[in-house]
Regions:
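Residue-level marker of regulatory loop/turn positions in helix-turn-helix DNA-binding domains and
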Residues: 1-4, 72
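Active-site core of bacterial EAL-family cyclic-dinucleotide phosphodiesterase domains
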Residues: 3-65
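Catalytic core of bacterial c-di-GMP phosphodiesterases, primarily the EAL and HD-GYP domains
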Residues: 37-38, 71-106
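A short, internal acetyl-CoA/4′-phosphopantetheine-binding micro-motif in the GNAT/acyltransferase core
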Residues: 65-71
């Protein structure tokens, strides 16, 4: 495994045991044919902390590492919980608001 992958994996492990610090869930709006928001897609992002500052790591890099290390299970649970909280909040304003979540094969 390359030095970069090892560095990212170490940061992912650290983030997972430190209350998912560095992980953020972003939401891409889903619109109906009249351009009204009816839902959102939950998108996981990861920011790796270093001496040079925070670096956003592409999901193309970090998702396979989460899957290979099986950290995807607790991180996936984190995403589900965050998305459910946001969905409940949004349902106060949009009754049938829904959130789409991509899940891992793991």
């Amino acid at each position: 495994m390359s030095l970069r992958k090892n560095t990212i994996l170490s940061a992912l492990r650290s983030a997972t045991v430190n209350d998912f610090e560095g992980f953020e869930v972003y939401y891409q709006p889903i619109l109906d044919s009249a351009d009204r928001i009816i839902g959102a897609e939950a998108l996981l992002r990861f920011f790796m902390h270093s001496d040079e500052g925070d670096e956003m790591i592409s999901p193309v890099e970090f998702i396979p590492l989460l899957e290979k290390s099986r950290l995807i299970i607790p991180v996936g649970e984190f995403v589900l919980n965050e998305a459910a909280k946001m969905c409940r909040e949004m349902q106060q304003y949009i009754a049938d608001f829904r959130v789409n979540i991509n899940v891992s094969y793991i």
